[in-house]
Amino acid sequence: MIATMLLGATLQAAPLPPEVWKERNRPDMPVLPPCDLGGGATIAHSIKGLPADVVSELTRFFDAAIPMSDAGGPFNSTDVVDGPVPNRRFLRAYQAGRYWVIWYELGGFVSGPRTIALHRNPARGNGASTFRMAPGTAFAGDLCIATKAILAGVRSASS
């Protein structure tokens, strides 16, 4: 019994050194150039700057159990599961017309910057409108080009 406990203690992973933990769970924010979408577009640099119904739809879509980290927050950039650190991190969002285009980082094997757009549903009987994910708006790569494409009506085939 004691030998088993000693073997288990020996095989237990040592805590990550602080610099490794930081690189894996709190990597630096990417430097993103401004994206000129023309007049009337607004920008949010934090989830806190989004309307409540947009945040609610993001939470529903991405699973409330594993929320998206806010800009600059903890973010698991690798495919190694290491605690409750989210594998998505908000970068910024643009509102133009009926859309909020969300820029975020995805960690893991297929890591990198992504977009997803939410479109405003028409007002309901009580006058309130809601936002829903717009199908075909998940793009990777140059987020500004993707945002302009989404606003021009381009949709991806894989969504």
What are these regions (language model features)?
Residues 99-105:
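Short beta-strand elements that form the blades of beta-propeller/WD-repeat-like
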Residues 93, 116-119:
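Short beta-strand element of the conserved SAM-dependent methyltransferase core
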Residues 2-12:
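Hydrophobic alpha-helical targeting segments used for export or membrane insertion
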Residues 120-126:
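Short loop/turn segments immediately following beta-strands, especially the blade-tip
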Residues 106-110, 139:
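Solvent-exposed loop/turn segments at secondary-structure junctions
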Residues 110-116:
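Structural motif
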Residues 130:
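Metallo-beta-lactamase
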Residues 12-98, 134-159:
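Flexible low-complexity loop/turn motifs enriched in small/helix-breaking residues
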